[in-house]
A protein has these predicted regions:
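Hydrophobic positions on the alpha1 helix immediately C-terminal to the Walker A/P-loop
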Residues: 307, 311
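Conserved NTP phosphate-binding and transfer environment spanning the P-loop NTPase/kinase superfamily
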Residues: 289, 411-489
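Ubiquitin-like/PB1-type beta-grasp interaction modules and other compact soluble beta-rich domains
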Residues: 1-105, 116-117, 129-130
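Conserved lysine of the Walker
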Residues: 304
Length: 489
């Protein structure tokens, strides 16, 4: 009898032997008891792998759970697949034209269905029930690789024309497809092992569609109640509408636009729309002479500084004299900056801002006094008081930007009638296809990499290592206050 081949696998601080071709899923089951949250992916010698993959060599393995960013995204991606499968099961293929995952609202996704299907409470109850049935059945989420031309033909047959168009512009020769039973779809990223992992979700009817509510990363077994974010939702819905009007609903549509030679006009239209909206905001501010402080808030690298300068131009066109001020210049001295639980400087919390100095100078300006605004040197880690003093005249207005500008604690000493609050973010309404979103955080991380390298003396490695802390800070310090804004952009 032929002896089975064995491989040595290092996990944590121990080395164990496993038979060749054992799945990572079987290895993960052995270690699940040591983890608070479910293991959903593995790193094999530093390379991310799905659990259905098999052991092929001596290696070192580390586990990824639903409480890790990569695992959390894989959970949401797989949950999207489960939802789409359930919708088609309940409604029937002939009654559906499109199932669209539009954008995130908190920890959930706003979705719509077009076709002969009416999205009401009864329909959502049946879809949710079907999703639970699929979870109970613990069906494998299978993966296969096909030639791109074959994928184009398949999705044409399935009526998923967004994917058919997407793959027409794909340069690689092969595509990975996933299936639950015989239902097949494409997802951009790794998936979970089976439907049995997808226990935590809730559907809420909202506006013209519904929200697929899922756990947050810090509580991966708890589904929070859906909280409507009306202003944010309307801004995103309007952006989706404009994309549809221009027939650029997905990346495939954008690629079509580029190859047809229409992209320059598309860019000009987008710029014109943005400038028109900025002009409208400036007119709103100019119509209220009591406003002396324009407060612009948004997450990291969302375009606050650029927006503040563009708004300033429009304010000048309305006869005002704007003075842009960055809250970042009011950071505490480096030696006074608080640290997080890991001993790293916490630049994202309001505690990193010298609120006393900020309040003092803003009140002095409101009282007609001269003030020298500080300039923070991020390399040296301290404020410098240089430049000409500032004094507000009748037509002067301060345009203040920073991640905490909507937090009432920052401007509690200033009267509400003197403030106009704006929330801005580089939101992504364009998706890869109807079932694969492009998270707005991805674009902001790229922007931050460039900014930190150019102006803050930080390497790409340092910026990426700090990003999880930045994201936690946004969830705590920024997003809870976005509905306080007078307008969103």
């Amino acid at each position: 009898m032929e002896e089975k081949r064995m491989y040595h696998v290092k996990i944590k601080n121990e080395v164990k032997e496993y038979e060749a071709a054992i799945t990572y899923h079987d290895i993960a089951k052995e270690y699940q008891k040591d983890y608070e949250h479910e293991i959903v992916l593995v790193f094999v010698d530093g390379k991310l792998q799905e659990l259905h993959k098999r052991l092929k060599k001596d290696c070192e393995i580390s586990f990824v759970t639903t409480a890790d960013p990569i695992g959390h995204e894989a959970y949401k991606r797989s949950m999207s697949f489960l939802l789409v499968k359930a919708v088609y099961d309940v409604a029937g293929h002939k009654n559906i034209d499109k199932v669209r995952m539009h954008f995130a609202i908190g920890p959930g996704y706003y979705c719509t269905i077009t076709g002969e299907t009416r999205v009401d409470d009864d329909f959502l109850e049946r879809v949710e029930s079907r999703m639970h049935e699929l979870v109970e059945a613990d069906l494998s989420i299978k993966k296969r690789t096909v030639h791109t031309d074959e994928a184009i033909g398949l999705f044409g047959q399935y009526g998923m024309y967004d994917k058919e168009e997407l793959f027409r512009y794909r340069r690689v020769s092969k595509v990975n497809l996933y299936s639950i039973n015989e239902f097949e779809d494409y997802y951009y990223g790794y998936m979970l092992y089976s439907t049995g992992y997808l226990k935590y979700f809730k559907l809420y009817r909202y506006d013209e569609g519904f929200v697929l509510q899922m756990p947050e990363i810090d509580k991966p077994e708890t589904v929070p109640h859906f909280e409507a974010r009306t202003k944010f939702f309307q801004v995103m819905k309007e952006s989706v509408k404009w994309g549809d009007i221009q027939e650029i609903e997905t990346v495939g549509g954008l690629n079509r636009n580029i190859t047809s030679g229409d992209v320059q006009e598309t860019v000009l239209v987008q710029e014109a729309m943005q400038e028109r909206r900025i002009a409208e905001i400036a007119q709103m501010i100019a119509s209220r002479p009591e406003i002396r402080f324009v407060l612009i808030a948004g997450p990291s690298s969302s375009g606050k500084t650029t927006f503040s300068h563009r708004l300033s131009v429009q304010l000048r066109a309305n006869g005002m004299r704007p003075h842009p001020i960055a809250v970042d210049n009011y950071f505490k001295e480096r030696e006074e900056t608080p640290k997080d639980e890991k001993g790293n400087y916490n630049f994202e919390g309001l505690c990193a801002v010298d609120i006393d100095l900020f309040e003092k100078q803003m009140q002095e300006l409101l009282d007609g006094k001269e003030v020298i605004i500080p300039n923070f040197d991020f390399v040296k880690g301290h404020k410098e008081f240089v430049g000409s003093p500032l004094k507000l005249g009748e037509h002067d207005i301060l345009v203040i930007e920073g991640i905490h500008c909507l937090n009432p604690k920052l401007t509690k000493a200033l009267a509400d009638e003197n403030k106009f609050k704006i929330y801005i973010s580089a939101l992504t309404q364009l998706n890869i296809d109807e079932h694969n979103r492009i998270p707005s955080t991805d674009g902001r991380l790229i922007r931050r990499l460039v900014r930190d390298a150019r102006t803050r003396g930080a390497s790409a490695t340092k910026t990426i290592s700090m990003w999880p802390s930045v994201r936690r800070g946004e969830e705590k310090n920024i997003f809870p206050y976005q509905e306080y804004a007078d307008v969103m952009f």
